[in-house]
């Protein structure tokens, strides 16, 4: 992933910072990623902000620096290569004809919504690694939305927006829809898709990050929803099952 802009220097991290950074750098090839030094600095600056805010606002239950990397950062980074594949495929379709993909925005990059974003996982990670993607992190908790705004300001991320709202409110007339709506350990697939359906572009997709393959949740989905792929993820240094459930509205029902 490339980025033309520069990020602020990474702040002072705990004594294990060098080892923790090496853990991330060593994991990148297995994740199919090639991040710049500036992007890595931004990711660790972001983790530092989470740590500072968590002391007051309890953004996350994970506080150990190594666990922050394995359970949060690497977990989110594991979703980036699959997301990149989807975005590139969507852009190829867009070049073939805008009628095929009316939800994509030519020349503006894709629009991604992270629902129930909390501390910004995975939304902030996506914004750092994909500077051409406009990322909106929405949460019903004001302090969490305020944190995302602070991250965008501190790390100078013009493609990152923090929004205090219910996701249902984003379906209002005149509101631009999203090409990808993602969530991570947020809600059941049925609730996730129902609540955010109005914000999804006609050719958009849902990207639900889950642990074990949620067969019961998939069986409970509305008939209007098509699960077109369940993608298994391998997260380095994390001995746990992870997957992405990719969904879309069935043909003839979008819009």
Put a short name on every predicted segment.
Residues 130-254:
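S-adenosylmethionine
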Residues 114-117, 121, 140-143:
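Hydrophobic alpha-helical segments of small multi-pass membrane proteins
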Residues 99, 107-118:
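Conserved class I S-adenosyl-L-methionine
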